[in-house]
Amino acid sequence: MPSFPVCPLMSAPLLSLALVLVPVLALPTAQAADMPTTPVENARIDDFAVGKKAIEAKNWALAASSFSKVVAKNPQNADAYNLLGYSNRWLGKYDEAFAAYNKALALDPRHKGALEYSGMGYLKVGQKAQAEAQLAKLQAICAQCEETTDLAKAIAAYKPAR
């Protein structure tokens, strides 16, 4: 059997140490994708910032693309799912919008933005009862919040399409 030269740096103890350290050093990165984020952390995410600017410019396609990238990298980011839903709602992609809102609410059932925006979406598709259900959840969380009053006003002004 042929013999191969052994690199002196790859001794058994060093190799064992490397096999232990590599997964340990990679752990914070792997865990980061599974952790929820805060507004401050979101502001540091390039695609999140691009998405927010796109929303301000009413560039819904760019916003949806940007927030899709955020949730691909951090599937626990309820804020990004909410804004992905918001962007898709403005694009008229209601199924995609509701899927994103539902994901945001699965991650954070008290997400006021997702409750409000999904309620607005339900009005857009003529499902007033579902919008009222979202309003009831908002009222239980924060009766005087802007999200609650905005959705209540939209429901009060709602007229079904003819």
Language-model segments: residues:
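Structural marker of alpha-solenoid helical repeat scaffolds
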Residues: 73, 107, 140-141
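Canonical positions in the second alpha-helix
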Residues: 69-70, 103-104, 137-138
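Alpha-helical segment of the N-proximal tetratricopeptide repeat
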Residues: 42-73
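Helix-start (N-cap) detector for alpha-helical repeat units in TPR-like alpha-solenoids
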Residues: 44, 78-79, 112-113, 145-146
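Terminal, low-structured helical/coil segments at or just beyond the last alpha-helical repeat
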Residues: 11, 15, 34-45, 132-162
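Canonical tetratricopeptide repeat
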Residues: 83, 117, 151-154
